[in-house]
Amino acid sequence: MIEPMAKAPALTPLAAAVLHVGEPERILQIECGEGDGALFLAREFPSARVRGVDRSGERVHAAAARVGLDPEGRIAFKQGTPRSLPFPADHFDLVTALDARPAPAETARVLRPGGYLAIAASNSPRPLSGPTGRLLRWRLRRLGYEPIWTAAAGEGGFSVVRLAGGEPGGRSL
């Protein structure tokens, strides 16, 4: 049994980020916290094995306790950092990071060739919309916000497949 998520609205950016990744078999959630993102991914991809990693042993313990009985071993959590992931090379089809910046080289190491890295970032459970949101997104682009993420992707040898956000439904920036 998997416990229901407490923070489902905050996971909207993660849901949008993994819309187009097919059916991954092995998923890693970086900086998983108490497991909301990993639990969401387990529901979204019912045949996948989901692993969460977090630098805090306390949060890893809390996340593991939330999983409940998982006789299939589909969901598990480990302590680790984005710069030193405790997993073998070329292991995951999908690596996700919700409000965390993964270490590009280490992420590339654990991601299988052809796999996906989905980074979802927001500072609010509600996306910015309307005139104020459009103005802020325009201003962020002018200040180089997009190049920061695309540059980070390039550090690990990644190509940006999709960059979206701001409006509900993932309208492009």
Where are the regions a protein language model picked out?
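Conserved alpha-helix/loop element of class I SAM-dependent methyltransferases that forms part
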Residues: A6-E25
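Conserved class I S-adenosyl-L-methionine
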Residues: E23-G33, A118-R139
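Class I SAM-dependent methyltransferase SAM/SAH-binding core
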Residues: D36-R83
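A short SAM/SAH-binding and catalytic strip from SAM-dependent methyltransferases
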Residues: D93-P104
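A short glycine-rich, Lys/Arg-flanked "PGG" loop and its adjoining helix->strand segment in the class I
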Residues: A103-Y116
